[in-house]
Amino acid sequence: MRTWQVNDVMTTAVVTVGQGDSYRDVVDLLVSHRFSAVPVVDDFQRVTGVVSEADLLRKIEYAGAEEPRLFDGRRRRDERVKASARTAGDLMSAPPVVVPSGTSIPAAARLMDGEGVKRLPVVDDLGRLVGIVSRGDLLKVHLRPDDEIQADVEAGVLRGVITDETNAVRSTVQDGVVTLTGRVDRWSTTDIVGRLTRQVAGVVDVADELEFDYDDRNILGTGVAFGIA
């Protein structure tokens, strides 16, 4: 079964800044493009940091503020440094949170959620920038046509699991919801089919209406079929 990856949905036309670009140039870029952040790259297109609107606003926030105090915490000291920054290299947050291009879409979504970010720079094996992926990009998988989703379920799930001709399973898809009907030999087969179907890109939900001849949950012990996380 093919797993959709970040490089399937990312935006490849990426606007960047260099570490030496001026504060005003960065502001102009964000305002003119209506971006909330921009990646900073070196001469080899490796991502070295990210400058966000929040980083730029430190200059306004600390304008005319009193001198740093001895007991100021590290976060406040860092903010003061950004308030006096003149270049993207001094403004940027580093190290950047990036995602490899071959990362699965669920893994990228978990990373965004865990880091509290709305978009991620996408890098290749050498750390070079190859794209940007946003929350909206990740949601593109749910715009897949129903017939494409059904084809993946049939080829990637049913033909791989249902090898016995006596196990007849049918699938239909409407608005991303997959309905599985038919009869198989045991409960564990229905569990595996259902779990794999939920992993198909674009599946909104699975209506599992499969019937089975033998309930093997007690034998398995956990009520979860082996081999599926």
Where do the PLM segments sit?
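N-terminal targeting leaders
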Residues: 1-33, 43-46, 50-229
